[in-house]
Structures are given as C-alpha cells and as structure tokens.
C-alpha cells in the first residue's frame, strides 16, 4: 500500500511513482537512462497526477528529494500547488529552505496559505524559514492565527501572535463568512481562559 500524504492511497502505482515511493534509486537510474523525463507529471488515478519531485515532497522523503533535484527535476513545476507550500505542510525546515526561492513568485493569497499549510501539517518549526524567505507572519499570518484560535490551538496561536500576527484580521472566507476576528473566535472557545 502506497500513501502519499493526504492525496491518497494506492495498492499499485505506475513504475516511476513506485520507484520514488520505494526509494529505488537503481530503478530510477535505469528509467532515466531510458529517457524518463522528471518534468512530466505521473498519472496516479483518473483525477490525480503529480510531478515526481512533488511525490517525494508530499512523502517528506528528503533523500529522494535530493536525488530528484540532483538528476534535473525542476523545483518550479508542480500540479497541486507550489512546492514551497507543500513542503511547509509535509516537511521540515531543511526541505522548506530548498524551495524558499519560490516565495518571491507567490501571490499574497498563496503567502497566506503558507501559514495555513503550517497549521494543517502541525509544522510550526517552518515559520522561521518562511519568514526568512520574506513571507512574514505580521503581513500574511492573520488567517492562520484566527483559525488556530478558533480550533483551540493555543501553542500555534501564541507563536503566531508573538511573531506579529494581526489580532484584528477579519477577512471573510468560507469558514468565517461573518469576518470574525481571532478575539471573537476565542470568546466561545473553552481552551482560552476568560477573564
């Protein structure tokens, strides 16, 4: 059974994807010599296709990520989302730093999403790398801060607040259609002390 993060599970995978998941570098070397292009997506199922490097990042397979990069995989290509965002959720700071150069190309919404990815992946250790890449909590962390408060994640909420998250962030979205702030979200939350 092959698991690729939250993307899905498969009993079998195409040859290249299986070699990546099995860390079969010998098989990949043979495939590369036979003309494998690491910059072509692999169809995993009817609706899911991923780049080879993307599979390794989703699996947080650091040696395979390095292998694929050393063999010419383009870090700027991804089917799901920019690899910096995937790494922020699925990997540690070492891998996030590999893709930090993508920060300059991200839209403001994608930069906000970076902190949501940190929250979803429970990877607060990646915040420092994102900030060093120019994606700062004080400018882009408000959405993740409000969500962390709403779900009672006091550790992440405190960390984001200490790093300058906007306590008054109140843009509406699908989860918070009434444009609530973190403070109004904290009031009914039993994890945060009242008083």
Which role does the model predict for each range below?
Residues 15-22, 27:
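Alpha-helical segment of the N-proximal tetratricopeptide repeat
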Residues 30-37, 66-74, 97-105, 128-136, ...:
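Ankyrin repeat domain, specifically the short helix-to-loop turn at the C-terminus of the second helix
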Residues 5, 20, 32-33, 57, ...:
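Ankyrin-repeat helical core positions
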Residues 27, 63-64, 94-95, 125-126, ...:
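Conserved ankyrin/ankyrin-like repeat signature
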Residues 85-96, 100-102, 109, 113-121, ...:
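Core solenoid repeat modules with strong leucine/isoleucine-rich periodicity
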Residues 6-18, 41-54, 77-86, 108-118, ...:
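Ankyrin-repeat boundary/"N-cap" motif
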């Amino acid at each position: 059974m092959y698991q690729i993060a939250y993307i899905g599970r498969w009993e079998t995978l195409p040859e290249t994807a299986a070699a990546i998941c099995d860390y079969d570098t010998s098989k990949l070397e043979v495939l590369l010599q036979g003309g494998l292009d690491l910059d072509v997506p692999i169809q995993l199922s009817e609706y899911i296709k991923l780049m080879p490097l993307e599979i390794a990042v989703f699996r947080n397979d650091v040696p395979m990520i390095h292998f694929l990069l050393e063999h010419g995989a383009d870090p700027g290509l991804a089917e799901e989302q920019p690899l910096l965002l995937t790494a922020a959720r699925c990997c540690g700071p070492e891998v996030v730093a590999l893709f930090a150069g993508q920060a300059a190309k991200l839209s403001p919404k994608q930069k906000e999403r970076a902190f949501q990815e940190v929250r979803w992946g429970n990877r607060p250790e990646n915040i420092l790398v994102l900030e060093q890449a120019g994606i700062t909590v004080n400018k882009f962390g408000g959405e993740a801060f409000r969500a962390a408060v709403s779900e009672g994640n006091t550790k992440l909420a405190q960390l984001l607040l200490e790093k300058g998250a906007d306590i008054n962030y109140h843009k509406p979205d699908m989860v918070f259609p009434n444009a609530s702030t973190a403070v109004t979200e904290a009031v009914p939350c039993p994890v945060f002390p009242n008083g």
